[in-house]
Amino acid sequence: MSKVKSITRESWILSTFPEWGSWLNEEIEQEQVAPGTFAMWWLGCTGIWLKSEGGTNVCVDFWCGTGKQSHGNPLMKQGHQMQRMAGVKKLQPNLRTTPFVLDPFAIRQIDAVLATHDHNDHIDVNVAAAVMQNCADDVPFIGPKTCVDLWIGWGVPKERCIVVKPGDVVKVKDIEIHALDAFDRTALITLPADQKAAGVLPDGMDDRAVNYLFKTPGGSLYHSGDSHYSNYYAKHGNEHQIDVALGSYGENPRGITDKMTSADMLRMGEALNAKVVIPFHHDIWSNFQADPQEIRVLWEIKKDRLKYGFKPFIWQVGGKFTWPLDKDNFEYHYPRGFDDCFTIEPDLPFKSFL
């Protein structure tokens, strides 16, 4: 059989997906985190892999799904939170724009799986399956009640799950995980399709969503999940030392308030007394596309007048950030390679080729 006749759609998908293969899995496994630091990698959306100086590995909000893939149904799902928010009927054109940079089924070394809330782009059945099948049988799944309910429904044993609410602290080796208040108002109107939100007092946020503060021996990381801006960030900043803060940023479509703006990101950094503020989530959805450089431009305008004590950092999906080594950098660039140029003699017809 000729090559073109033996190739199928399935063989094409298996040969190209996930786009990064196990490259990032291998990089994370090989990383030796120096004392007094922590390393983290952006997995897309709000997915983060955190590794401490003691070699503790935790992932939070690692999601391996996709967005819209067809024009087949022109209408939004009945009762969707965006429909409730803005009274819309048309399909939301949210296509996934970020490649898959980590293979969940190539994960072997992990000490905890966490989720901030139960929205589809923050918790993933494939990740749960991969960890259950390929990793140690004592890896905990940590999240608010709605997330634990999902995991148990997927088949994760109840004894492997830890329900957290604001004020709880979970120790995973040398990382201390503090569950803090979340400010994700969209989560409160994520309801069964037949349930009305109008005129009904919403249930509490604590069962639905939490923010996390990861305290490592080398520094602290604040993960805000899908939280909107809240004055309460200042309380968190008063109560905890926060080195790096991650915030969900995006260009909200007309009639929608679901992501923080550039001004919100700066207010969050100031309120938390953070040293570095990093936007995320803006990478993933085509209809929330936003330019993170806007945050830096606004920071430049305000920093001297308002005496900001933090800097913004513009990241790339799949990239590594090391605290405090990268604290004075403003932008990430993927490794460019070719650092070993001219370690062997070039093979060229003559030097003018150079």
UniProtKB/Swiss-Prot annotation:
Single Gene Ontology BP annotation: L-ascorbic acid catabolic process
Molecular-function annotations in GO: L-ascorbate 6-phosphate lactonase activity; manganese ion binding
Known catalytic reactions: L-ascorbate 6-phosphate + H2O = 3-dehydro-L-gulonate 6-phosphate
Enzyme kind, highest EC tier: hydrolase
Compartmental location: Cytoplasm
Entry's Gene Ontology cellular component terms: cytoplasm
Induction: Induced by L-ascorbate. Repressed by UlaR.
Pfam families attached to this UniProt entry: Lactamase_B_2
Disulfide cysteine pairs (residue numbers): none
Co-factor(s): a divalent metal cation
EC number in record: 3.1.1.-
Keywords of the record: Cytoplasm, Hydrolase
Pathway(s) where this gene product acts: Cofactor degradation; L-ascorbate degradation; D-xylulose 5-phosphate from L-ascorbate: step 1/4
InterPro entries listed in its UniProt record: L-ascorbate_6P_UlaG, Metallo-B-lactamas, RibonucZ/Hydroxyglut_hydro, UlaG-like_MBL-fold, UPF0173_UPF0282_UlaG_hydrolase
Record HAMAP family: UlaG
Family: Belongs to the UlaG family.
PANTHER family: L-ASCORBATE-6-PHOSPHATE LACTONASE ULAG-RELATED (PTHR43546:SF9), UPF0173 METAL-DEPENDENT HYDROLASE MJ1163-RELATED (PTHR43546)
Record protein name field: Probable L-ascorbate-6-phosphate lactonase UlaG
Organism annotation: Shigella flexneri
Gene that encodes the chain: ulaG
